[in-house]
Amino acid sequence: VQNTTPKVALITAAALNGAIGIENRLPWQLPDDWAHFRRVTAGKPFVMGRKSALAEDALLSDTRNLILTRQAQPALPPGCEPVPSLEEAARRLAHEPEWFILGGAEVFAQALPIANYLYLTLVNGFFEADAFFPFHQLRWAEWELLHSVRREPDDRHRWAFAINEYQRRR
């Protein structure tokens, strides 16, 4: 019997204090984390909130971008499809073997219960932010760490960070 459950993955970078953004941009620059993001998400559909889609540093999928919005006729970047709810996005992507949820904070909070994978880059620092990952909702006992790569600061990365991949325990 073939497993037809899609891989629904949250992907984010968060600081030790949960910071994921300030004024609709990332609080840090981590080129190797961007490269990891592009590598694991290549060719996969994305789901994100409207503000994330409109961010200056937004990365859009070359496959499909579903944008969660309550607005009837939102101004969105080309190639983006508005959807009224996460449930509707999941319905539209039911045939996809894998798709990614990119945030922001409110979307992550809604999506945690349905996600079965988590790509979490943990940035070793505390940052001023106005958007935070909902760590308080994450039940760590439900997640198994599959892979972790730690990076120390260098000439391209001001902060240490760890790229972690988790799978929800069955």
Residue ranges and their predicted role:
Residues 1-170:
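Enzymes that bind and transform nitrogen-containing heteroaromatic metabolites
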